Amino acid sequence: MDLYTFTLQYPSFLFPGKTQYAEGPAPADLKIVRCINSTNPFNWRDVARHISREHYDLAVFAYWMSFFAPCYTALARRLKKTSCIALVHNMMPHEKSLLDKVLPPSFVKTMDGFVALSRSVLEDVAKMDKAQKPKAWSPHPVYDHFGAIEPRENALEHLGLDPQYRYLLFFGLVRAYKGLDWLIEAFADERLRKYPLRLLVAGEFYEDKEPYLKAIQSYGLGDAVVIRDAFIPDEQVKDYFNAADIVVQPYKSATQSGVTQIAYHFEKPMLVTNVGGLEEIVPNGVVGYAVEPDPRHIANALLDFFEHDRYADFVRNLRVEKEKYSWEKLANVILNLK
């Protein structure tokens, strides 16, 4: 198996972050070929020729936004002797534009089949696939490459966090649809003030941070919200999850999320909103909470978690539930797609 990735993934005007490149070493046990320029049609031709010469039986295209449709379409059209399967994270992005109606249909036509990472995404694919090609869904496997479960105290020390507090973790890029504003409002609920809590926001802001800072100030939260506005490198991910008591994803819209699968690996209870495919992965009352998407329901779940000390029960269940999400199972779904 060979992995083909990008020399240029996004042009700078589409990428609001500080860098789109991983700074750590590449995995030593994988053959990774950096050769795809997402914006250069001449490059697509050359890459397709190279891939064709390798005579692969199967090519899996990881698809998550419409921007990549022209590049992927051009590659797939030239791989005439290779079966092309789309591994679909999102068929339609969370923040839609006119291009999201124009670009995906051509990509869908060039694929021989589809594996979606949630039922809701599978439904989106089915609406676009007029040829009724083979398709299935399989949840994203657990992300197990970020390190081991370690003592909470060690993680807090590494992050410079006070161990007298319990931590709610909001992890990942901050965008409007992810509902951090709802979480801040929920966290300000007076019923939670009797507990020693801190909200830890770890991720780069992809939009104006000022409205969030104003909300924190207006609710009088002050030092109760700790913000680490930066892309979190792989080697630091374990500290944030090992430090957390609960991982909160208060999304306003979603299909599925890799954050849940990191939380499963580190056996951390989760609070998600019941939008998209999130509640498929986080059964309510088993490994955490799947609640209505509004601040009041989020606050109610947080209160239940800390008031009734649900942590140990959820962790026991997490150890059982996470066995469902193996990479072998996803591979079998892809290989058996008919």
Where on the chain are the PLM-derived regions?
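Donor nucleotide-sugar binding/catalytic pocket of nucleotide-sugar-dependent glycosyltransferases
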Residues: K109-I149, N336
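Short hydrophobic beta-strand element within catalytic cores of glycosyltransferases
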Residues: Y264, P269-V272, V282
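Nucleotide-activated donor-binding/catalytic signature segment of Leloir-type glycosyltransferases, i.e.
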Residues: E210-K238
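Conserved donor-binding/catalytic core segment of Leloir-type glycosyltransferases
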Residues: L161-K178, I184-F187, L199-L200
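Conserved acidic donor-binding segment of nucleotide-sugar-dependent glycosyltransferases
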Residues: N284-R296, L303-D309
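Acidic donor-binding loop of glycosyltransferase active sites
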Residues: D239-T255, K268
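Acidic anion/phosphate-binding donor-loop and adjacent secondary structure
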Residues: S97, A126-K127, P141-H158, Y165, ...
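N-terminal strand-loop element at the rim of the active site
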Residues: M1-R53, V121, K135, E207
